[in-house]
């Protein structure tokens, strides 16, 4: 992904010393904020499901999904990446180097929280709020009861058992 993005966007890089992109420019332009979802791939574990859920979450917050890459992205899509207000690094093992390069070269803000799990989803929402300078966003309804439910579902079944976790790095760590 990094090589594709860098190769395609090299000729669009801002002149050295120019001002960085403002992640809140969407306000001046009178539109909704938009983000790129970077990292999902065809070989990823449940990537299509993750994209669907993250898009729903973004929609709830009033944020548009601009480009999803590399999954399904064309060279024309990759050329549109700098039009977004920020990049969401959904799979750091695939997209972190691209997001860091876009941050350095285009001044694009990067959201690093991966919304897998209740606490991580809350961090993701708050990071989006800070990066895009959104108005206050409501907390997830009944969030205080969710961790208890999450802990209790498999706790008796898995207690004392050995398990093997098979997934990409993002899902395994989550």
Predicted segments with their positions:
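An N-terminal assembly and electron-transfer interface module characteristic of large anaerobic redox
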Residues: 1-174
